[in-house]
Amino acid sequence: MGAVSGKTFYIETFGCQMNAHDSEKVVGTLLAEGYEQVATPEAAELVFYNTCSIRDKAEQKVFNRLQNFKREGMKGKIFGVLGCVAQQEGEKIFDRAPHVSLVAGSASYTRLPEMLVQLEAGNRRVTGLSLDTEETFDTPFTRRDNPHRAYLTIIEGCDKACAYCVVPFTRGPERSRTSESVMAEARGLTEKGYTEVQLLGQNVNSYRDPSPAGWDFATLLAKVAEIPGMRRVRYTTSHPRDFVRPIVDAMDANEAICDHIHLPVQSGSSKVLAAMDRLYTRDEYLRRIDWIKSAKRRYSLTTDIIIGFPGETDADFEQTLDLLDEVQYDSLFSFKYSPRPNTSALAMEDRIPEEEKQRRLLTLQEKQRAIQIRRNAEMIGSIQEVLVEGRNQALGQWIGRTTCNRTLNFSHPDTNGNELVGKYLPVRVTRSGPNSLVGESAALV
């Protein structure tokens, strides 16, 4: 393609698993073209930021980082902004950060070598912002960060248009990958030694196979879990509107599908949910929770909650706190509402004062912390299978993840090297905290 071999690059990733996987595609694509990845921006000739725009704080972090580099006088480097902020802001990024030379959205990663050649040829600024492509599904050079767990994208974009969310604008409409393509990549991963796969999408539940097979998400999930050598299958993220009973049935029927369901509720108030354009009520959400809790297996439940959406009253907030008591989530991600461009909520009045949003957020987090302490304590004495991920050198322990997505630090007679990484071990839980478990190996390797 004409790219200059030997160019060094650094990439920093902000945001979700989708962004992390996108960065893996960027790294693999550039390595295949002869570029060399380095560990620090100071050592790189090309500096990329793969960005998140879901909240204003994440966006500002990127621009602050760019300004710091400008002040530090890192001359001679090429700076590139990738991902959701790139898609959202486009060429306006050049005005906010004039030393940036490249702006590329999430559907343009395979074009990066070509764009870099344009910069080498003398173009001062290059953009890649088209969403009219499915090329991100088929990036053959993906360089995965983890040798045992792999991300696998099954759907891109979102059609839901929630009032607060910029994702439909930055990621485009829903585009499902063919089941044949998904299955081929999943089989290829197991053949390379990967034992855990996480199916990714802005809304995995709305997956619809565009090929004649016509699989829905529940069918795809079951088929991936049946692949020989596939030990664990996870998925994220789900939209409650599209979370249907057959998904739970598929999980019950195949133990390779992990005991964890992330089902973002956003609010416990039906009034706020309607204002958010979430397309379900509190009762409809709780009906799905009933499906999960009445299943054959015990599933870990996690969620997302937005605090301080315009018009949220004290009574609305109390309904959200009440929902925590009713559902008993194993953990949650909570955020203050952040106005985003190109969203309908941007024009809403009755904004909640920042100090009140902060008070509500802390109240919510305090309640959830108590629930998590209790939920984790219930696991003391149980034996959990963990996939060993590494070592906690400071504590002299190993770190693993359970099928229910809890972090478990544990002791084991093998205290040297990394011989256990990638193995599945039974671990007895002996202690617990609000965010993790502690245990000891229940069997020698």
UniProtKB/Swiss-Prot annotation:
[4Fe-4S] cluster 2 binds at C158, C162, C165. The keyword S-adenosyl-L-methionine applies. It is found in: Cytoplasm. Binds 2 [4Fe-4S] clusters. One cluster is coordinated with 3 cysteines and an exchangeable S-adenosyl-L-methionine. It comes from the Bacteria. It catalyses: N(6)-dimethylallyladenosine(37) in tRNA + (sulfur carrier)-SH + AH2 + 2 S-adenosyl-L-methionine = 2-methylsulfanyl-N(6)-dimethylallyladenosine(37) in tRNA + (sulfur carrier)-H + 5'-deoxyadenosine + L-methionine + A + S-adenosyl-L-homocysteine + 2 H(+). One of its GO terms (molecular function) is metal ion binding. [4Fe-4S] cluster 1 binds at C16, C52, C84. Gene3D superfamilies: Methylthiotransferase, N-terminal domain, tm_1862 like domain. SUPFAM superfamilies: Radical SAM enzymes (SSF102114). Residues 377-443 form the TRAM domain. Keywords: 4Fe-4S, Cytoplasm, Iron, Iron-sulfur, Metal-binding, S-adenosyl-L-methionine, Transferase, tRNA processing. Its EC number is 2.8.4.3. The keyword Iron-sulfur applies. Residues 144-374 form the Radical SAM core domain. InterPro entries: Elp3/MiaA/NifB-like_rSAM, Methylthiotransferase, Methylthiotransferase_CS, Methylthiotransferase_N, Methylthiotransferase_N_sf, MiaB_methiolase, rSAM, rSAM_horseshoe. Residues 7-121 form the MTTase N-terminal domain. This is tRNA-2-methylthio-N(6)-dimethylallyladenosine synthase. It comes from Solibacter usitatus (strain Ellin6076).
